[in-house]
């Protein structure tokens, strides 16, 4: 189509420095949301845009924001430096991600446009120093932005020109309603605003009335998830809870799931139970949760994206169950403490090249399923979603399928063709491993990991800043070992491999390494001449007695 050809990045009137940054990122063409939103934003219109997760919403507001700021500095009257752009996001991780994207797009104009993120867990004094320099764009959560506004370390009433609310449908459910209303009192009467959301609900409608002025609504006609040619979605019915653990063990140990995978569970306790269970079989994983320091969570995501880990267990108590309005959640499902209410996993976080999403626990809402599934099959890459379902959860599964199917009444979640009787030989192993993962073991594992991550996060912060290469050596998937680990469980004998898979799969076996104590002993022995010296003397042969 001619119209679509006329709306490439090079035809949007963008600054050459932005075009160069877009080229460096490897974006040959804008996504649908970018193609529609950027020209309208450059015309000065308020936008209410809905697009599915992974569709490029961040760049859809970041590019016009940078273009408008650069154009103003190049053609407008000379005015003092001030904060002119504000980006509000529901979680610290999303704030860091938004800042990173804006900085990448501003690579060639970094002197003209500066970006600051004030949501990180730093002391307010250091953040105040950053804000005193008056960056052009400030990114943060509503609570942290409001705190700086109340302390007068951030002033927006006379300077703000652009306001962005990203993942708008989550802000109220994360408990930011009061902060948002208070924050708006510190803004000028006139400004351009963008509201970006994956879904349109009552919360988004309320935000629209609070923030937008005669907006253009972009409700793109696209499915909430990629089509079956890109994203394959399966369900597998497990008769018991034990069957779920058994099936997961077989999928991972026999390498039936290839590439990087995300395992979603509904509670923090379940995530550690699953990690300790897999640890019994020498399957390394790491848990991403809100109890860990922000630096540790971001480091885990970064290393996962770089290929350090093949499997991450994720939990996001903030988006499970009914939204809590007007207050922060103190506890998630089954009493899990949400120690960091601004930590989020299932929505918006950019995991790179995820081959498979495994819903070990059925998502509590159809929307949660969409957000989880959106972690794979991004940027035209293929992906698989496999959902484990108990017989008692069939009704809830039907609700998810109803939302996914829409007008197309065909089945979306196809049955996963797997014969459980083929892996019955592994059941006794799984049962043995499940028994050893007690509540006490889970408590000890959580405490141990939090202590270690706090140490890594705080004590080594300055060291890693001076020695960035050593940061790559810091692992988050090392065994916790509060449960009794039986070494033989890490090995899969050939007779246990299902007949249909023999010769096709090779259960990955970890190369045996000498323990540090063995290596030290061997080195000490080789360096000690008294212990390493060997003398081969002539053997004594008795002479024959004369007769």
Curated annotation (Swiss-Prot):
Protein EC: 3.6.4.13
Keywords: ATP-binding, Helicase, Hydrolase, Nucleotide-binding, Nucleus, Phosphoprotein, Ribosome biogenesis, RNA-binding, rRNA processing
Signal sequence coordinates: none
Tissue expression from the record: Detected in heart, brain, liver, pancreas, placenta and lung.
Record localization: Nucleus, Nucleolus
Location of the motif DEAD box: 166-169
Phosphoserine modifications at: 126, 532
Gene3D superfamilies: P-loop containing nucleotide triphosphate hydrolases
GO molecular function, one term: protein sequestering activity
SUPFAM superfamilies per record: P-loop containing nucleoside triphosphate hydrolases
Short motif Q motif, span: 7-35
Catalysis performed (reactions): ATP + H2O = ADP + phosphate + H(+)
InterPro entries associated with the record: DEAD/DEAH_box_helicase_dom, DEAD_box_RNA_helicase, Helicase_ATP-bd, Helicase_C-like, P-loop_NTPase, RNA_helicase_DEAD_Q_motif
Ranges in coiled-coil conformation: none
GO biological process: defense response to virus; modulation by host of viral RNA genome replication; negative regulation of type I interferon production; positive regulation of neuron projection development; rRNA processing
Enzyme class: hydrolase
Family, as annotated: Belongs to the DEAD box helicase family. DDX56/DBP9 subfamily.
Protein name per Swiss-Prot or TrEMBL: Probable ATP-dependent RNA helicase DDX56
Gene (name only): DDX56
